[in-house]
């Protein structure tokens, strides 16, 4: 008798995706982040659902409803902090996942890569809207500043901003719609993740060498299921350490002050995972220019397959490109640091140099290094 998992219409989809899937025998721990992102998403949806049961999306009660969750709801504090810090873990995994794709040339799977970029944008939008919901000072002013950036769009900018706000300022209508969108987006992300996997399974996984692994495949289960479980345990360990020992480490103290439209915080800044993009935005004196640079800093990922000039797919055997890749990582860490600093000397110039370096590395230096390495192969 044929095994039910191979014949049942639903089970065979699961089987072909997670059990009998032929996987390269040499994929490293850098390939764990896809499954970790799936776990993060499920965790965020579950904790978010329980938070939504007690949250009220109204300007007068939003802040106190979050306080009520932390003080009066059974284990509300742990659900709230798991959700807030779960977002941080989500972005850590996202950055690692994208970094892995850049290093090992996974972007040559164009469809998978482009869906991934859309997923990144969707996740960033969701996280931004979620940050507004507690209706603290940084929630309110973050929403005001970031939505206001759209006013830089010529001709329709101001109308667009007021349309998003649902009025002439960030108010009750804004909060309500942000809550609605924040609730629905994770399900859209889950659907996109399935499409992401669908495209990936059309080609099969890449591997550290960047060479076809068709000659040496192993079944996903049990080899990579057990490996993913280990990754998941480490993820949960890191998350729970953060939640139980220093839940506010990555948050902003200003968000424990209820939103006040009449009082601007001294330093308006987003959550840590947006700081690199925020630094790029701030380093350009022109408003529209800053907004364009902000969008392009992420959208540049779409160009990666076009900028690939190397004869080799992976960076595994390309020392010059490796060096530039790690300089890019250091540059992004510098931008993250700058994004959290006040706009004053010397931070302004450091931010501008780091922003120039970011685009220069991706658009000019890395393709040049690849060409040099191609020529070195001839010697």
Curated annotation (Swiss-Prot):
Q: Which residues bind heme b b562?
A: 83, 182
User: Quick one: which residues bind a ubiquinone?
Assistant: 201
* TM region(s), chain numbering: 33-53, 77-98, 113-133, 178-198, 226-246, 288-308, 320-340, 347-367
Q: Which CDD domains match?
A: cytochrome_b_C, Cytochrome_b_N
**Could you say which residues bind heme b b566 here?**
97, 196
InterPro entries according to UniProt: Cyt_b/b6_C, Cyt_b/b6_C_sf, Cyt_b/b6_N, Cytb/b6-like_sf, Cytochrome_b, Cytochrome_b_C_euk/bac, Cytochrome_b_N_euk/bac, Di-haem_cyt_TM
An example GO biological process term is: mitochondrial electron transport, ubiquinol to cytochrome c
Give the chief site where it resides.
mitochondrion
UniProt KW Mitochondrion keyword: yes
The cross-references to Pfam families, in alphabetical order and at most eight, read: Cytochrom_B_C, Cytochrome_B
GO cellular component, alphabetical, reads: mitochondrial inner membrane; respiratory chain complex III
The record gives the membrane topology as: Multi-pass membrane protein
Q: How is the cofactor bound?
A: Binds 2 heme b groups non-covalently.
Q: What does the subunit section of this Swiss-Prot or TrEMBL entry state? A: The cytochrome bc1 complex contains 11 subunits: 3 respiratory subunits (MT-CYB, CYC1 and UQCRFS1), 2 core proteins (UQCRC1 and UQCRC2) and 6 low-molecular weight proteins (UQCRH/QCR6, UQCRB/QCR7, UQCRQ/QCR8, UQCR10/QCR9, UQCR11/QCR10 and a cleavage product of UQCRFS1). This cytochrome bc1 complex then forms a dimer.
Q: What does this protein do?
A: Component of the ubiquinol-cytochrome c reductase complex (complex III or cytochrome b-c1 complex) that is part of the mitochondrial respiratory chain. The b-c1 complex mediates electron transfer from ubiquinol to cytochrome c. Contributes to the generation of a proton gradient across the mitochondrial membrane that is then used for ATP synthesis.
Q: Which family does it belong to?
A: Belongs to the cytochrome b family.
Protein name, entry field:
Cytochrome b
Recorded source organism is: Cephalophorus harveyi
What does the organism's lineage look like at the top? Eukaryota, Metazoa, Chordata, Craniata, Vertebrata
Q: Gene of origin?
A: MT-CYB
């Amino acid at each position: 008798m044929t095994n039910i998992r191979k014949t049942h219409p639903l089970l065979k989809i699961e089987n072909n995706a997670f059990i009998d899937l032929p996987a390269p025998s040499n994929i490293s721990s850098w390939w764990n982040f896809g499954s970790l992102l799936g776990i993060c998403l499920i965790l965020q949806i579950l904790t978010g659902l329980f938070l939504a049961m007690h949250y009220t999306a109204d300007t007068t009660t939003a802040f106190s409803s979050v306080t009520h969750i932390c003080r009066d709801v059974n284990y509300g504090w742990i659900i709230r902090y798991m959700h807030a810090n779960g977002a941080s873990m989500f972005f850590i995994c996202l950055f690692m996942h994208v970094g892995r794709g850049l290093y090992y040339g996974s972007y040559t799977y164009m469809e998978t890569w482009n869906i991934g970029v859309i997923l990144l944008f969707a996740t960033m939008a969701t996280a931004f809207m979620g940050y507004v919901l507690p209706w603290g000072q940084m929630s309110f002013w973050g929403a005001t500043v970031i939505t206001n950036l759209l006013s830089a769009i010529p001709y329709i900018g101001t109308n667009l901003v007021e349309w998003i706000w649902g009025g002439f300022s960030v108010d009750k209508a804004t909060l309500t719609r942000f809550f609605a969108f924040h609730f629905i987006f994770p399900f859209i992300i889950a659907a996109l993740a399935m499409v992401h996997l669908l495209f990936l399974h059309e080609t099969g996984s890449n591997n550290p060498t960047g060479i076809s692994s068709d000659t040496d495949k192993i079944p996903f289960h049990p080899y990579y299921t057990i490996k993913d479980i280990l990754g998941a345990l480490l993820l949960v360990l890191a998350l729970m350490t953060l939640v139980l020992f220093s839940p506010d480490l990555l948050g902003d103290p200003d968000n424990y002050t209820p939103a006040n439209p009449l009082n601007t915080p001294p330093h308006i800044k987003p959550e840590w995972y947006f700081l690199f993009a925020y630094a790029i935005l701030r380093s350009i004196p022109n408003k529209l220019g800053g907004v364009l640079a902000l969008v392009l800093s992420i959208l540049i990922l779409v160009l990666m397959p076009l900028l690939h000039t190397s004869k080799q797919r992976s960076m595994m055997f390309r020392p010059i490109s490796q060096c530039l890749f790690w300089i890019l990582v250091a540059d992004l860490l510098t931008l993250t640091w700058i994004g959290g600093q006040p706009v004053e000397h010397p931070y302004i110039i450091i931010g501008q140099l780091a922003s120039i370096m970011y685009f220069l590395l991706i658009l000019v230096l890395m393709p040049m290094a690849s060409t040099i390495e191609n020529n070195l192969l001839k010697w």
